[in-house]
Regions:
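Low-complexity intrinsically disordered segments
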Residues: 2, 15-18
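Generic early N-terminus positional signal peaking at residue ~5-7
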Residues: 5-7, 19, 29
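Cleavable N-terminal signal peptides
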Residues: 10-13, 22
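Sec/Tat signal peptide C-region and signal peptidase I cleavage site
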Residues: 18-24
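Flexible loop/hinge segments at secondary-structure junctions
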Residues: 24-136
């Protein structure tokens, strides 16, 4: 590979990475308006099955927000999360979060249940729910 080709490939890579991060969605964890704020560590504990006082809600496995949420919150990818929940379910130590079709369904379920928590796009937040944490 000559220098000119390498320089072009490097430029394409930089542009691709820059555009990829520029379009990242803002994700927030939400709860019932009466809920107290949670730290990211507390949220991770709920979504990893370590805290059963709250009821975590998931979006569909095929939804891009789901993979993004778990990666940002726990550092784990979708396959790792799925395997972890399969293990917890098999051993009787937990039950995977209930899947809902989209952010509106999550928001509606969270608004109706004081123990439920979920995640949605920041732009979808309204007065029916409370932002518990920003997921960066």
């Amino acid at each position: 590979m000559n220098r000119a080709t390498f320089a072009r490939l490097s430029s394409v890579l930089v542009v691709t990475v820059t555009l990829g991060t520029a379009h990242a969605i803002d994700i927030v964890a939400i709860g019932n308006p009466a809920a107290a704020p949670l730290t990211k560590e507390q949220l991770a504990n709920v979504y990893l099955g370590h805290n059963q006082a709250l009821t975590p809600l998931d979006q569909l496995e095929s939804a891009p927000i789901r993979a993004d949420y778990y990666k940002r919150l726990t550092g784990r990818d979708s396959a790792q999360i799925k395997a972890m929940w399969a293990r917890l379910t098999f051993t009787g130590k937990g039950q995977s979060p209930r899947e809902l079709p989209d952010s509106n369904a999550v928001k509606k379920a969270v608004a109706a249940d004081p123990k439920a928590i979920g995640y949605i796009e920041k732009s979808a937040v309204d007065d029916s729910v409370k932002v518990l944490a920003n997921i960066d």
